[in-house]
C-alpha cells in the first residue's frame, strides 16, 4: 500500500513539474533515459518530503516491499535514522531483511538435510556466489551460500549503522553473535527471536 502511495506521489510530482512520467514501446533510448532520470529525481524529492514529514512507517514499508534497490530508499533512510539517533526505526528497517534472508537459508538447509542428511559446510563456504548466481544451474548448496552471503552482507551493513548510532552494547553484541552463527552455519530458527522488533 505504501509503495502505491509513494509511486502516485512521485508521478504527481513529475506531472506538476512538467517531467516525463509515462513511456511507450515506441520511445527512443534517449526518451527512455530522460524518463528514468526524471523518475529518480521524483523518487529523491518524495523521499525527502516524506522524511521531512516523518512518514517513517510508510517509508520503511516501501523499503521492505523490495520494489526499489537498497540505495534508492533503504540506505538513505537508514542514514537518516543514524544521523538523527532513531534507533527503534533503524531496528525496524534493518532486522526484517536480515531475518528473511536467514529464514530462507534455514529453509534451504532443511531441504538439503532431508536429501543428504549431512550438510557440507566447507563446500558451502567455498562456493563463489556471484558465479553461482550468474549461472543457470540450481543446487541447494548454492542457494544456501547465496542466502548466507546476503544475510552476512546485511548484518555487516547493519553493524556499521549500529556502531555509528552508538547502539546499546548488549544489542550490538547480539547482532555480532548473529553474524558469527550465520557465518559458521550453526544458526537455528530460535536465534532469530531477538530480531523481531516492530514500531
Regions of interest found by a model, annotated:
Residues 50, 54, 101-104, 162, ...:
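Alpha-helical junction/boundary sensor with strong preference for TPR arrays
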Residues 1-67, 198:
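N-terminal alpha-helical interaction modules that lie
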Residues 47, 78-79, 98, 114-117, ...:
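Conserved small-residue packing positions in alpha-helical repeats and bundles
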Residues 32-40, 67-75, 101, 134-136:
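Generic helix N-cap/helix-start motif at coil->alpha-helix transitions
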Residues 43, 74, 94, 120, ...:
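TPR repeat positional signature
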Amino acid at each position: 500500500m505504501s509503495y502505491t502511495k509513494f509511486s502516485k506521489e512521485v508521478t504527481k510530482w513529475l506531472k506538476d513539474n512538467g517531467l516525463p512520467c509515462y513511456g511507450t514501446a515506441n520511445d527512443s533510448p534517449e526518451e527512455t533515459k530522460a524518463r528514468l532520470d526524471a523518475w529518480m529525481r521524483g523518487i529523491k524529492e518524495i523521499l525527502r518530503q516524506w522524511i521531512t514529514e516523518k512518514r517513517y512507517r510508510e517509508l520503511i514499508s516501501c523499503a521492505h516491499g523490495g520494489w526499489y534497490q537498497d540505495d534508492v530508499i533503504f540506505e538513505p533512510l537508514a542514514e537518516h535514522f543514524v544521523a538523527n539517533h532513531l534507533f527503534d526505526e533503524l531496528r525496524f528497517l534493518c532486522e526484517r531483511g536480515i531475518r528473511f534472508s536467514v529464514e530462507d537459508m534455514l529453509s534451504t538447509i532443511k531441504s538439503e538435510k532431508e536429501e543428504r542428511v549431512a550438510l557440507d559446510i566447507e563446500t558451502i563456504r567455498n562456493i563463489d556466489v556471484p558465479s553461482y548466481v550468474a549461472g543457470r544451474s540450481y543446487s541447494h548448496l548454492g542457494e544456501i551460500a547465496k542466502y548466507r552471503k546476503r544475510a552476512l552482507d546485511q548484518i555487516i551493513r547493519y553493524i556499521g549503522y549500529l556502531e555509528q548510532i552508538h547502539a546499546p552494547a548488549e544489542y550490538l553484541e547480539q547482532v555480532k553473535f548473529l553474524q558469527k552463527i550465520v557465518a559458521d552455519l550453526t544458526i537455528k530458527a530460535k536465534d532469530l527471536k531477538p530480531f523481531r522488533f516492530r514500531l
